[in-house]
Amino acid sequence: MEEISARLNAVQEKILDLYEADKTDLPSQIEHWKLIRMECALLYTAKQMGFSHLCHQVVPSLLASKTKAFQVIELQMALETLSKSQYSTSQWTLQQTSLEVWLCEPPKCFKKQGETVTVQYDNDKKNTMDYTNWGEIYIIEEDTCTMVTGKVDYIGMYYIHNCEKVYFKYFKEDAAKYSKTQMWEVHVGGQVIVCPTSISSNQISTTETADIQTDNDNRPPQAAAKRRRPADTTDTAQPLTKLFCADPALDNRTARTATNCTNKQRTVCSSNVAPIVHLKGESNSLKCLRYRLKPYKELYSSMSSTWHWTSDNKNSKNGIVTVTFVTEQQQQMFLGTVKIPPTVQISTGFMTL
């Protein structure tokens, strides 16, 4: 017992020295997590040996030590990957490389420049939720590290990586819990992003986005959304800019010109006209694409199976999948969010249903 106690004391002393030094270089942060990893291993061994207390501290369960050790190993490996990237010489604090920040949304990414995003439900200042978006998000992939910028729109918080829009928080998830009308507005960076009441939460259309622009790195990390108390709600004198998404009800035109048509003068006057997207390509590719589109059901109204023109060559392996939308805004959101393979041809237009 004396030997394992002495080793644990030595490791914890080194950890305290790092806390007191408060260094901001990456090698120091890697060393910190190596020591935490050793601490987990010693506590795990102590529990296996039957000790309930060691160095005047309670020895955690085997499962607790094992779970934390796995998280620490993953974090240490990510830091070592980061140390091989162009961001290795940047300033990195204990807080920025903490397990809490590593695991908060978006999880398993390093993050800097946090900014609070407040979502107000039902136009009620007492019914709000606070989230943290990040000006810098460092995505670790195998042996590479990519920095992206956190963005906000009416749908939620996201970043763009490899030309793909990746949402890491959907506001509608909490709207289902806290909103009676399923409507909300987003307050961020002196702006308010709102959506017309004519568009429901499952038919959210394209909105303006707000980039995170702040140098405040000292904000405490938030691993989850924070429910704001009514007493914390105060009015500020700072002017707010409202950003509205397009409202189809405000469009008085009864006819729209169809796109990708030979006859450019043709107009569609039926009230049952729906925006569509034709996806044309090899049948097997379309089948895979249809499977990949299932998680994006909120971005379209319906999707057909793979079909063919009867006049086409019967030996052709190409097919067509038709996707319909409620509004043109929803169509544009679909095209801006979903990553379509370059082998698939995209055509937009309108169809009478």
UniProtKB/Swiss-Prot annotation:
Residues 273-353 are annotated as: DNA-binding domain. GO terms for cellular component: host cell nucleus. Phosphorylated. Residues 1-200 are annotated as: Transactivation domain. It is found in: Host nucleus. Residues 206-215 have a biased composition (Polar residues). Belongs to the papillomaviridae E2 protein family. Binds DNA as homodimer. Interacts with protein E1; this interaction greatly increases E1 DNA-binding activity. Interacts with protein L1; this interaction enhances E2-dependent replication and transcription activation. Interacts with protein L2; this interaction inhibits E2 transcriptional activity but not DNA replication function E2. Interacts with protein E7; this interaction inhibits E7 oncogenic activity. Interacts with host TAF1; this interaction modulates E2-dependent transcriptional regulation. Interacts with host BRD4; this interaction mediates E2 transcriptional activation function. HAMAP family: PPV_E2. This is Regulatory protein E2. The gene is E2.
